[in-house]
Amino acid sequence: MKNVLILAAAVASMSTLPAWANADMAQKKNCMACHALDKKLIGPAYKDVAAKYAGQKDAADKLAQKILKGGSGTWGAVPMPANPQVTEAEAKQLATWVLTVK
């Protein structure tokens, strides 16, 4: 009985974990129209973004704000537009995921 309760608690806690972003979410949110995992398109490759921000403790927050509000000047002349279809939580998930791309 104790094992059943432990298993039930473990399963219940999994349902409260945040959904992790991945390439599918990036595709659905139109990020892949300008970015790719490993090559520059209109915007930088995600692996290059991850390398640039590696080791910066506030990198996920910075990138999440760029996803939400857009930005310019970091990667060249073409500005990144704001992304209004992305929620704040999704922006943070996407930014955290981008930082893991190798």
Spell out what each predicted region is.
Residues 33, 42-53, 66-95:
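Axial heme c-ligation environment in periplasmic c-type cytochrome domains
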Residues 97-101:
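C-terminal alpha-helix
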Residues 24, 61, 88-92:
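Residues in well-ordered alpha-helical elements
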Residues 1-22, 102:
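N-terminal export/targeting leaders of redox proteins
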